[in-house]
Amino acid sequence: MNDKAKSILDIRQILGLLPHRYPFLLVDRVLDYTPGECITAVKNVTMNEPFFQGHFPDVPVMPGVLIMEALAQAGGILVVKSTDTSVEGKLFLFTGMERVRFRKPVYPGDRLELHCRLLRHKLKLWKMEGKAYVDGQLAAEAEMTAAVMNREDM
């Protein structure tokens, strides 16, 4: 897709694009995207998240690795919407993360806004910059590399 189409995707549409399901689906809505360029998505963080039972019971904080996973899932949606190939039988897998920084804790009740920008794409590899914000403040950032793989090759 080379057009500059912009759209909003709800949870039903996201379920059709990502293989993740509860409790590991970490994108609730896509606010905006431009194929081949960028995406803005949202994860609404609630006290009902299963990870808050142990991280940490008295001071619940969203684990940083799950913030990275939420960014990766948003990036996966961007990849799917940026290609003409079917997602049927494919998985989007992390191959690396660089310059990972956690700037602000994420708590129950926060709305995590996920921004991913495509840096480059070559063959099956996609490199993106991801930034997660809460109330306009940077909570986490990273450069992420992922590969699109066929399920039967795994």
From Swiss-Prot:
Catalytic activity: a (3R)-hydroxyacyl-[ACP] = a (2E)-enoyl-[ACP] + H2O
Sorted UniProt keywords: Cytoplasm, Lipid A biosynthesis, Lipid biosynthesis, Lipid metabolism, Lyase
A Gene Ontology molecular function term of the record: (3R)-hydroxyacyl-[acyl-carrier-protein] dehydratase activity
Active site feature: H55
Subcellular location: Cytoplasm
EC numbers for this chain: 4.2.1.59
Recorded GO CC terms: cytoplasm; membrane
GO BP annotation list: fatty acid biosynthetic process; lipid A biosynthetic process
Protein task: Involved in unsaturated fatty acids biosynthesis. Catalyzes the dehydration of short chain beta-hydroxyacyl-ACPs and long chain saturated and unsaturated beta-hydroxyacyl-ACPs.
HAMAP family assigned to the protein according to its UniProt record, in alphabetical order: FabZ
Family that this chain belongs to: Belongs to the thioester dehydratase family. FabZ subfamily.
Name of the protein in question: 3-hydroxyacyl-[acyl-carrier-protein] dehydratase FabZ
Source organism: Oleidesulfovibrio alaskensis (strain ATCC BAA-1058 / DSM 17464 / G20) (Desulfovibrio alaskensis)
Name of encoding gene: fabZ
